[in-house]
Regions:
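Conserved S-adenosyl-L-methionine
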Residues: 172-298, 321
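Short glycine-/small-residue-rich Rossmann-like dinucleotide-binding loops
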Residues: 310-312
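Short amphipathic alpha-helix with an adjacent loop that forms part of the alpha/beta core around
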Residues: 81-83, 295-304
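A conserved beta-strand element that flanks and buttresses the S-adenosyl-L-methionine
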Residues: 307
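Short loop/turn motifs at secondary-structure junctions
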Residues: 23, 284-285, 302, 338
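Conserved active-site beta-strand-loop modules that form the wall/rim of enzyme catalytic pockets
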Residues: 147-149, 204, 304
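Phosphate-coordination loops involved in phosphoryl transfer and adenosine-cofactor binding
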Residues: 86-89, 193, 256-257, 303
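Accessory substrate-recognition/RNA-binding modules or partner subunits associated with SAM-dependent
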Residues: 2-138, 142-147, 151-167, 315-336
Length: 338
């Protein structure tokens, strides 16, 4: 079976390495994703265990779609009875335009009509449209008048780990945070017993993702929804086995004792980080506290990783105050962490 894993820009090599670790073969890297081959188990493992992927897609058909009629016919060439069970719900995501399909909403409607018309004709029933957590989410990409129709096995973006109860302004996406931790060498540092410190932790994403990594916790294990659960081709026994395996690995990983801390001057951010950590079932594993950057010291020893996402862009605020923040951060790094 052939699949496609979408991912953030600049992360494809990390995603490809993860996929190969899950058993994928013939991985091909693109700017924002990885094409790969594997069994359904490989795809399920990617949904459950990938720390960097955004979505896992199962391509069903690729065809010329110069206009709406060609799009409709191409979508109808797929046997939807093999994928959408009776009384299921359906959503369509459509990306891309062309001279004669100039709006994504129009493309999505045409795709939906083709699917619904086929199912009504063959089964006498039609799926209901449900934008939020449907049984089956169909993904259509239109590029240079060629359409690729896929099933979205993830259902919603895999960066949504289900632990973020509250966020802060412009939070870092979880899969991007995980990729940055990988680039910084955190897995090897954690394996050697090193510490993790984020002195500007916001809602705690770096520390929580670092803990999930260090303790061998599947990032998708907290999620209650995946796009394949309502799919007619879903293998329930296989998924149950993978969930049980993830539970056993989580229990084994809890024996690891590492110092993983996050500080922030904002009391609201710290409350959010603590709540997020509790939802991730990391109470007593990670530590968050309100602490000003000016009093930052190294009380974690000489082996570890300091990582931070300082304010920029949407979070820039007062530019003069920001200059002071960066100056203080540089001073504390030179003083305590060289």
């Amino acid at each position: 079976m052939q699949f496609f894993a979408s991912c953030p820009l600049g992360v494809a090599d990390l995603t490809a390495a993860e996929l190969r670790n899950f058993g994928a073969s013939r991985t091909s890297e693109y700017k924002r994703g990885v094409q790969f081959e594997g069994t359904l188990e490989v795809a399920y493992r990617a949904c459950l265990w990938s720390r960097t992927a955004s979505r896992i897609l199962l391509p069903l058909a690729t065809f010329p779609a110069p206009d709406a009629d060609a799009l409709y016919a191409g979508v109808q060439s797929v046997d939807w009875t093999a994928h959408i069970a009776p009384r299921s719900t359906l959503a369509v995501e459509f990306a891309g335009t062309s001279p004669r399909i100039s709006h994504t909403h129009f493309g999505a409607l045409k795709t939906k009509d083709a699917i619904v018309d086929q199912l009504r004709e063959r089964t006498g029933e039609r799926p209901s449209i449900e934008v939020d957590r449907p049984s089956v989410r169909v993904d259509v990409r239109l590029d240079r008048e060629r359409a690729t129709v896929s099933l979205d096995l993830s259902g919603e973006s895999l960066h949504r780990r289900a632990y973020r109860a509250r966020g802060v302004a412009a939070p870092l996406k979880e899969n991007l945070a995980a990729a940055i931790l990988m680039r910084a060498g955190w897995p090897a540092i954690a394996e050697a017993g090193g510490a993790l410190l984020d002195p500007m932790c916001g809602s705690g994403t770096f520390v929580i993702e670092g803990a999930l990594m260090a303790l061998d916790i599947a990032p998708g294990s907290l999620r209650s929804y995946f796009g394949f659960v309502g799919w007619a081709g879903h293998d329930r026994a296989l998924w149950a086995r993978l969930i049980e395996e993830a539970r056993e690995r989580r229990e084994a990983g809890r024996n690891r004792k590492l110092a993983m801390r996050g500080y922030d001057r904002d009391a609201f951010a710290i409350r959010a980080a603590i709540e997020n950590a509790e939802r991730a079932k990391l109470r007593g594993v990670v530590h968050f506290e309100r602490r000003e950057l000016q009093v930052l010291t190294n009380d974690l020893g000489s082996r570890g990783l300091l990582i931070a996402n300082p304010p920029y862009g949407e979070r820039i605020g007062d530019k003069e105050a920001l200059q002071g923040v960066y100056a203080t951060l540089g001073e504390k790094l030179r003083e305590h962490f060289e």
